[in-house]
Amino acid sequence: MPSAKPLFCLATLAGAALAAPAPSRATDFNKRSTCTFTDAATASESKTSCSDIVLKDITVPAGETLNLKDLNDGTTVTFEGTTTWEYEEWDGPLLRISGKDITVTQSSDAVLNGNGAKWWDGEGTNGGKTKPKFFYAHDLDDSKISGLYIKNTPVQAISVESDNLVIEDVTIDNSDGDSEGGHNTDGFDISESTYITITGATVKNQDDCVAINSGENIYFSGGTCSGGHGLSIGSVGGRDDNTVKNVTFIDSTVSDSENGVRIKTVYDATGTVEDITYSNIQLSGISDYGIVIEQDYENGDPTGTPSNGVTISDVTLEDITGSVDSDAVEIYILCGDGSCTDWTMSGIDITGGETSSDCENVPSGASCSQ
């Protein structure tokens, strides 16, 4: 009679296999090791294979995005060596990272080189060559970007559309664009975001150091801005989201720039700018305006005629000091009828320029003279 033992063993093994729990995604993910990628395609294809991604000396082909979208929760991305992008006219972005609880950082000598000079023609996004935006930090939630050194972006450097994102000690160096035709090289463009903290940033460029177009609970501290258009809110109005609320710029310097502090809203649009603080801002070498708040932007340019559809309320301007050029205006405020309310100004000491006689509808608590 055949032995039943093998049958028993098979049944036992089969039962054990059925009883064993399936490995969870979290367990599987935690077991994965560091992966080092040296080409963009493999990095994009295999980005969910590791908990720690190292990008080493990658050259991204022309017209392609280094795509790290939809990373696994908790992933760390580290740039090593030089990351470069080859030239092609297109909209970009050159780099995209998204996910939750993501850390983006680099080794001490790494450079993210956008090769912007190949696109620069003095036109920026207003014409000439089609230029790609550099880094989309969109849907990069509960995350941190730390210590990146970004050089020569074709146009705007970092576009932020995220919630609860910390950006610390990032350098954006587009200073070569001063002599080579850089234009619209914004440092940080923030839209439709909440709880964004930027500390210790250094921005050398030819447009806004920071531009907040919409969003709430945004904090910028310890920044060093030079060559551009200053610390800006707006233009607000005419977008899907037209609210900017609870924004603080503090303990920062703006030098060799067109403006120091700026808020601008769109003519005949609607929206809200509320609970805004500029505190301890040091200015030097400002060519146009030390402080400028105006409600007259149309098709990207000021018209001199304000409207009141966007309200600007609860604004604190304190301890803004320094110098502007002799033909610059120290303070310029152009509000619509009744749309600017509840402002306070204190500790304003801006010297070297002119006092504007063209201010309109200046709210109680503010002044165009010192």
Curated annotation (Swiss-Prot):
Active-site residue list: D207 (proton donor), H229
SMART domains for the chain: PbH1 (SM00710)
Entry's family note: Belongs to the glycosyl hydrolase 28 family.
Subcellular location: Secreted
Reactions this protein catalyses: (1,4-alpha-D-galacturonosyl)n+m + H2O = (1,4-alpha-D-galacturonosyl)n + (1,4-alpha-D-galacturonosyl)m
Name under which the protein is recorded: Probable endopolygalacturonase A
Highest rank taxon of the organism: Eukaryota
UniProt keyword Repeat, yes or no: yes
One GO molecular-function entry: polygalacturonase activity
The organism's taxonomic lineage, starting at the top: Eukaryota, Fungi, Dikarya, Ascomycota, Pezizomycotina
Glycosylated residues, chain numbering: N246
GO process annotations (BP): cell wall organization; pectin catabolic process
Record gene name: pgaA
Signal sequence bounds: 1-19
Keywords from the named record: Cell wall biogenesis/degradation, Disulfide bond, Glycoprotein, Glycosidase, Hydrolase, Repeat, Secreted, Signal, Zymogen
Annotated EC: 3.2.1.15
Its biological purpose: Involved in maceration and soft-rotting of plant tissue. Hydrolyzes the 1,4-alpha glycosidic bonds of de-esterified pectate in the smooth region of the plant cell wall.
PbH1 repeats: 162-192, 193-214, 215-235, 244-265, 273-295, 307-352
Disulfide bonds: C35-C50, C209-C225, C335-C340, C359-C368
SUPFAM superfamilies: Pectin lyase-like
Keyword presence, Cell inner membrane: no
Residue numbers covered by the propeptide annotation in the UniProt entry: 20-32
One GO CC term on file: extracellular region
